């Protein structure tokens, strides 16, 4: 795209002096419409210059019409230029010449002239009486004095003043109208040029669907997608060989910065008052001293020397303002170079320079890029070395050979990666100290739109350009001397062409750079940053065998610790103190083995430790031992989690007391046993119970029972379970379904007035006699204490398997077993009737007239109250108002399963 700026400026200058009043519909006809306006003689016949001006202006008026239709010709352009010169000369001579007839020309003004001589200052200085009146009136500041001044004048003088005011208003109105028309024409031309740029951008684009939506504008348009549309178009302009024009750069950078500050809701006026107020920040003295030291080292010529003292003051204010804005970063060496270049683009405006600096450091560059430890910078340097291996493998291998050779020749010293010395300076100053100014500005334009990825791309392009001369170096000394010469050539703009450099940057790979995000994430957690406080005495080098940082492919210690601890889940907190203690021990050993006062981590990021393999081996063995000892803790935690889940389920059931009543528990709908999924796939252990049987004396068993009773008597959960089982047994008894659990609980309940029940408790603690095929074993001991149902006490790691086996056996009962269970239930029920008078009376009344009550399997403190509304709705059963509803009842198969389970527990 080649746009001729001279043609545009010629059109603009010619359109600035368009005569709109000499046509048939000019200002002469409009001016005569003013009431009381004085008569003006238009000298179109006597004065030769004015006649020629009229003729030329007529031609110019026609030229304007053709200019609007974009069909100008060269001859008409020349006529406009001649009319411009003639009009200026005529205006000057007619306004200020003396002699006869000058008063006649002094009483009129060229309405359509836009020069300073014919402005308001020119006719205000004229010596007519009306102008004198207006001048005296303007000297009265207050309206009261002006009123008094006008009251002193007669009617003729007031009419003359009025006519003079009308004449001036008419002249200014004509000028304003002409300026508005000129603005419309210029906006039309700007839109035409923007359309040309849009067509060029779409022509050189990749013909994607997104590229068809490109629309170039100088400023973001109003609307939801106005800024994004402008951003995409300017990003495409920055990719062109010529880049963003220097006339647009200030406006483009400020637009980006303003949009960022608006997105984070910053009150800029308040920020300006805070950041540029020296009195509110008295603790910046030390920072100001450091800034003053760096100001004299600024590379920009406009900030060096005795003549640039005022510019250095402005630069210091901007640097201090950013340090107050971002106190986390404060001031970093290299900021003076960045701020100087920004101030140069912003034409010395402090506020605008601070805006752009905030946008560049806080938004564009990665976090902690200029922090105390320069972590993000060290990450980018490590990533850049990987990119050099990928894109420039021959150069990378050659530099590795030079580095290894230098390490061998140094006799125990360390040679950092050869690219680090130069790449660090390039990244810190964003190439402001190694490339010419116009090339740096193009790079910055791309950085503002594409991000910090441009820095890596430009570095790759520069090393690719320098690679041919670097490959001739035989050792590291030759490399550094060659790079010193090449750096000077780059700065003098004799080695790298800016257009070629930017084309290489954009054609290198697609955006974003492949694998760049993965590499940055990898080195973010696998890198040793530059230490903020450098300790020269506490750290030292090592004489043992070391590996180059470029060849590092192992996992860092932090990653090993994080992965190992993270795999343990909830037990990671147990290992954290031990890991910290172990890492401290390893660190102390390293310090004892050190011999020199230099640390590799301080010289280069990603340095390798000499005892890494030993550290990994010891750490892995420790982790394996720790994991084996924590299996029991894992089992205990799993059992606690399971109990909590059961408690939550019971709480949900209890809370649902107001819901629809059902005689079937949710836990009894599915008769399948609960299986521990951690034990799936584990073979059942065949236990010979006859050989492993262990007979405990009665005294020891009674002691165990008493201890178990004391430990569990005051448990609120046990009390809740006992009440829950009693309610289930009582409800089933009322419905005609027997259950021995509640009856046994009632029979073995310890009343307050019977002190001899402790003996019965001791007797029930004895293991009952089983059938001929079963004997008491060590693996399982059945205890029954405090009126509770028997529960097994497990003492073996296969306890969960035994529970599953016992439940499975309980589900498959023979008919004989069912008969025994029913007989035992009837006997137990009769014994309970003979023991308690209240219970016998209730049972007799139940036998005589069985009354089905509302069954609620949940314990409740107060009896349920029946409401009339619920009874009418049929919630308590059928009545006269509601039809008969068949409510669900317990099936026979369910009764058998429940009774069989109870019988198995009793055995």
From Swiss-Prot:
UniProt feature, compositional bias: Low complexity: 831-843
Coiled-coil ranges per UniProt: 583-645
Ranges annotated as biased composition (Basic and acidic residues): 749-762
Compositional bias of kind Polar residues: 892-907
Cited PROSITE patterns: EF_HAND_1 (PS00018), TBC_RABGAP (PS50086)
InterPro entries, alphabetized: Rab-GAP-TBC_dom, Rab-GAP_TBC_sf, Tbc1d30_C
Function per UniProt: May act as a GTPase-activating protein for Rab family protein(s).
Protein name stated in the entry: TBC1 domain family member 30
Biological source species: Xenopus tropicalis (Western clawed frog)
Organismal lineage: Eukaryota, Metazoa, Chordata, Craniata, Vertebrata
């Amino acid at each position: 795209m080649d746009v001729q700026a001279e043609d545009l400026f010629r059109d603009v200058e010619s359109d600035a002096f368009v005569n709109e009043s000499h046509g048939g519909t000019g200002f002469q006809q409009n001016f005569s419409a003013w009431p009381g306006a004085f008569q003006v003689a238009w000298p179109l016949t006597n004065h030769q210059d004015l006649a020629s001006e009229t003729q030329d202006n007529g031609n110019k008026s026609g030229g304007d019409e053709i200019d609007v239709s974009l069909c100008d010709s060269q001859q008409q352009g020349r006529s406009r230029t001649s009319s411009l010169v003639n009009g200026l000369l005529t205006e000057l001579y007619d306004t200020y010449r003396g002699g006869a007839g000058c008063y006649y020309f002094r009483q009129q003004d060229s309405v359509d002239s836009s020069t300073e001589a014919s402005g308001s200052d020119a006719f205000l200085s004229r010596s007519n009486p009306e102008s004198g009146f207006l001048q005296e009136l303007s000297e009265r500041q207050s309206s009261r004095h002006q009123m008094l001044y006008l009251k002193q004048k007669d009617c003729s003088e007031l009419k003359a003043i009025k006519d003079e005011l009308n004449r001036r208003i008419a002249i200014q109105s004509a000028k304003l109208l002409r300026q508005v028309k000129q603005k419309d024409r210029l906006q039309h031309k700007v839109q035409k040029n923007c359309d040309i740029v849009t067509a060029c951008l779409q022509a050189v684009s990749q013909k994607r669907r997104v590229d068809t939506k490109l629309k170039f504008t100088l400023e973001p348009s109003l609307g939801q997608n106005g800024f994004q549309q402008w951003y995409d178009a300017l990003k495409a302009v920055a990719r062109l060989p010529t880049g963003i024009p220097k006339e647009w750069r200030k406006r483009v950078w400020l637009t980006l910065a303003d949009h960022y500050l608006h997105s984070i809701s910053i009150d800029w006026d308040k920020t300006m008052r805070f950041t540029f107020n020296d009195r509110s920040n008295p603790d910046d003295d030390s920072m100001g001293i450091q800034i003053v030291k760096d100001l004299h080292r600024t590379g920009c010529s406009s900030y060096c020397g005795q003549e640039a003292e005022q510019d250095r003051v402005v630069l210091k204010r901007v640097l201090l303002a950013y340090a107050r804005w971002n106190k986390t970063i404060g001031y970093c060496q290299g900021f003076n170079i960045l701020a100087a270049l920004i101030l140069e683009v912003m034409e010395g405006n402090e506020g605008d320079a601070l805006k752009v600096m905030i946008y560049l450091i806080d938004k564009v560059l990665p976090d902690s890029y200029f922090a105390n430890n320069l972590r993000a910078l060290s990450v980018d340097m490590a990533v850049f070395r990987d990119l050099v291996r990928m894109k420039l493998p021959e150069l990378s291998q050659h530099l590795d050979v030079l580095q290894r050779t230098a390490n061998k020749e140094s006799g125990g010293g360390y040679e950092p990666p050869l690219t680090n010395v130069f790449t660090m300076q390039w990244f810190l100053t964003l190439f402001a100290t190694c490339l010419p100014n116009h090339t740096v500005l193009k790079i910055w334009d791309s950085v503002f739109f594409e991000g910090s990825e441009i820095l890596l791309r430009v570095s790759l392009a520069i090393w690719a350009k320098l690679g041919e001369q670097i490959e001739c170096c035989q050792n590291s000394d030759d490399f550094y001397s060659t790079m010193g010469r090449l750096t000077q050539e780059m700065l003098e703009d004799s080695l790298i062409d800016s257009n070629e450099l930017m084309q290489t940057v954009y054609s290198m790979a697609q955006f974003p750079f492949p694998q760049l995000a993965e590499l940055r994430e990898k080195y973010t957690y696998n890198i040793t940053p530059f230490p903020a406080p450098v300790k020269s005495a506490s750290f030292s080098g090592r004489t043992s065998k070391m590996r180059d940082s470029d060849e590092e492919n192992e996992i860092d210690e932090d990653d090993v610790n994080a992965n190992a601890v993270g795999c343990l889940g909830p037990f990671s907190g147990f290992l954290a103190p031990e890991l910290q203690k172990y890492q401290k021990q390893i660190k102390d050993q390293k310090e004892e083995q050190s011999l020199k006062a230099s640390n590799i981590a301080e010289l280069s990021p990603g340095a390798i430790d000499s005892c890494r393999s030993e550290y990994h081996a010891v750490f892995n063995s420790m982790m394996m031992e720790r994991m084996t000892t924590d299996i029991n803790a894992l089992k205990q935690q799993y059992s606690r989690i399971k109990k909590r889940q059961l408690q939550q389920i019971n709480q949900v059931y209890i809370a649902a007391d107001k819901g629809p009543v059902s005689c079937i528990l949710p836990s009894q709908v599915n008769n399948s046993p609960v299986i521990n999924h951690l034990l799936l796939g584990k073979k059942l252990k065949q236990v010979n119970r006859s050989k492993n049987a262990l007979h405990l004396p009665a005294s020891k068993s009674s002691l165990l029972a008493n201890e178990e009773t004391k430990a569990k008597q005051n448990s609120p959960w046990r009390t809740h379970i006992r009440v829950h089982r009693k309610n289930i047994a009582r409800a089933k008894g009322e419905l005609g379904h027997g259950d021995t659990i509640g009856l046994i609980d009632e029979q073995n309940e310890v009343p307050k007035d019977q002190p001899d029940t402790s003996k019965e408790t001791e007797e029930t603690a004895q293991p009952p006699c089983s059938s001929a095929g079963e004997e008491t074993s060590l693996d399982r001991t059945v205890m029954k204490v405090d009126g509770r149902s028997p529960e097994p006490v497990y003492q073996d790691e296969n306890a969960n398997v035994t529970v599953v086996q016992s439940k499975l056996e309980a589900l498959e009962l023979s008919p004989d077993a069912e008969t025994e269970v029913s007989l035992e239930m009837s006997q137990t029920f009769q014994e309970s009737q003979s023991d308690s008078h209240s219970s016998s009376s209730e049972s007799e009344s139940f036998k005589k007239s069985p009354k089905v009550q509302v069954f609620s399997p949940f314990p409740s403190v107060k009896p349920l109250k029946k409401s009339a509304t619920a009874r009418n709705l049929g919630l308590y059963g059928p009545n006269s108002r509601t039809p008969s509803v068949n409510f669900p009842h317990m099936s026979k198969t369910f009764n058998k399963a429940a009774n069989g389970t109870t019988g198995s527990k009793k055995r």
